[in-house]
């Protein structure tokens, strides 16, 4: 097994007290956000549940700023996501009934990768992002915590994996400090998310 399971994702979020408005973990058939007036978050897999899933991404809705945040740890663009996973951000947005006659939804997505393709840590990065969202809301990306991560050009073979590996070290330190569940299960979680788990670069 590699990566986080749905149960582990929820338990990590719970340990960080980040479950207010959390709709759950979903596969590629996520129905979308439907409540315009409440904070909502979700962690979605780009693959079908019955096939074990492929890659986690995170979604968050801030009704105050009317912004939907999409976070992909690998930073893929829509065409790349479709090419690699047969998954579309556009379809995801369309399924969310958040627009109104007098307000347009502003979609904000990261354009850089923060995770190395050699690691199985997409679930951990998604939990970290939702922590940033709950703490900073409309500044989910533009805050000192998230900006502690190095950004890189999205690529199957990262041009500078060293910086992305530093992000992983930062992530483990963050969870070790903030999450009792992580501390209690550190060896198991690290073994399933560690750098070098997937052969993607030398």
Curated annotation (Swiss-Prot):
Matches recorded under InterPro entries: Papain-like_cys_pep_sf, Peptidase_C5
Induction data: Expressed in the late phase of the viral replicative cycle.
Principal subcellular localization: virion
Subcellular localization, as worded in the UniProt entry: Virion; Host nucleus
Annotated keywords: Autocatalytic cleavage, Disulfide bond, DNA-binding, Host nucleus, Hydrolase, Late protein, Protease, Thiol protease, Virion
Reaction(s) catalysed (UniProt annotation): Cleaves proteins of the adenovirus and its host cell at two consensus sites: -Yaa-Xaa-Gly-Gly-|-Xaa- and -Yaa-Xaa-Gly-Xaa-|-Gly- (in which Yaa is Met, Ile or Leu, and Xaa is any amino acid)
GO cellular component: host cell nucleus; virion component
Gene3D superfamilies named in the record: Adenoviral Proteinase, Chain A (3.40.395.10)
EC number: 3.4.22.39
MF terms in GO: cysteine-type endopeptidase activity; DNA binding
Activity control summary: Requires DNA and protease cofactor for maximal activation. Inside nascent virions, becomes partially activated by binding to the viral DNA, allowing it to cleave the cofactor that binds to the protease and fully activates it. Actin, like the viral protease cofactor, seems to act as a cofactor in the cleavage of cytokeratin 18 and of actin itself.
Miscellaneous field: All late proteins expressed from the major late promoter are produced by alternative splicing and alternative polyadenylation of the same gene giving rise to non-overlapping ORFs. A leader sequence is present in the N-terminus of all these mRNAs and is recognized by the viral shutoff protein to provide expression although conventional translation via ribosome scanning from the cap has been shut off in the host cell.
Role of this protein: Cleaves viral precursor proteins (pTP, pIIIa, pVI, pVII, pVIII, and pX) inside newly assembled particles giving rise to mature virions. Protease complexed to its cofactor slides along the viral DNA to specifically locate and cleave the viral precursors. Mature virions have a weakened organization compared to the unmature virions, thereby facilitating subsequent uncoating. Without maturation, the particle lacks infectivity and is unable to uncoat. Late in adenovirus infection, in the cytoplasm, may participate in the cytoskeleton destruction. Cleaves host cell cytoskeletal keratins K7 and K18.
Protein family (similarity comment): Belongs to the peptidase C5 family.
Subunit structure of this chain's protein: Interacts with protease cofactor pVI-C; this interaction is necessary for protease activation.
Record's protein name: Protease
């Amino acid at each position: 097994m590699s990566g986080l399971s749905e149960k582990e994702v929820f338990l990590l979020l719970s340990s960080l007290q980040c479950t207010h408005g959390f709709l759950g973990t979903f596969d590629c058939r996520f129905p979308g956000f439907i409540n315009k007036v409440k904070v909502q978050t979700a962690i979605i897999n780009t693959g079908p549940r019955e096939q074990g899933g492929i890659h986690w991404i995170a979604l968050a809705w801030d009704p105050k700023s009317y912004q939907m945040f999409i976070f992909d740890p690998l930073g893929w663009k829509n065409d790349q996501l479709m090419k690699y996973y047969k998954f579309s951000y556009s379809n995801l947005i369309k399924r969310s009934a958040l627009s109104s006659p007098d307000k347009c939804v502003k979609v904000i997505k990261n354009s850089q990768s923060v995770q190395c393709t050699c690691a199985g840590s997409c679930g951990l990065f998604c939990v970290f992002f939702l922590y940033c969202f709950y703490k900073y809301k409309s500044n989910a990306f533009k805050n000192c915590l998230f900006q502690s991560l190095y950004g890189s050009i999205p690529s199957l073979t990262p041009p500078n994996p060293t910086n992305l590996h530093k992000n992983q070290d930062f992530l483990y330190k963050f969870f070790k400090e903030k999450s009792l569940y992580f501390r209690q299960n550190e060896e198991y979680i690290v073994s399933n998310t560690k750098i070098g788990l997937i052969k993607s670069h030398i």
